[in-house]
Amino acid sequence: MGMNKRKLALGDRNIIGARVTEARTAQGILQKDLLARLQVKGVDISLPALSLLEGQKRPVSDIELKALAEVLQVDVRWLLGMI
């Protein structure tokens, strides 16, 4: 992830958080902008919840997973670490 080193250890509540952060930052998308894009898809996540998700300290639903893949323009399988 380059210069943006994670300050806190990742949790174990999901497996996509680090990839969400990687894709978001690579595209220059701020967390608040990601939230706005998710809301357009009908997924309403708060900023603290997104921070927990990215830190792998919050579970993610299948609906959130699909929307995150769409707005970040990545494959769901990539978010899951399968490819």
Task: List each model region and its residues.
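A short, Lys/Arg-rich alpha-helix, primarily the initiator
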Residues: 1-27
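Conserved hydrophobic/aromatic packing and binding residues within compact polymer-binding modules
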Residues: 20, 34-35, 50-53, 79
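Acidic-residue sensor for enzyme active/binding pockets
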Residues: 31, 54, 64
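DNA major-groove recognition helix of helix-turn-helix/homeodomain DNA-binding modules
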Residues: 57, 61-78
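Residue at a beta-strand N-cap/secondary-structure junction
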Residues: 17, 28, 44, 59-62
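Short basic helix-loop element that most often maps to the first helix and adjoining turn
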Residues: 18-40, 67
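Recognition helix of helix-turn-helix/homeodomain-like DNA-binding domains
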Residues: 39-60, 82
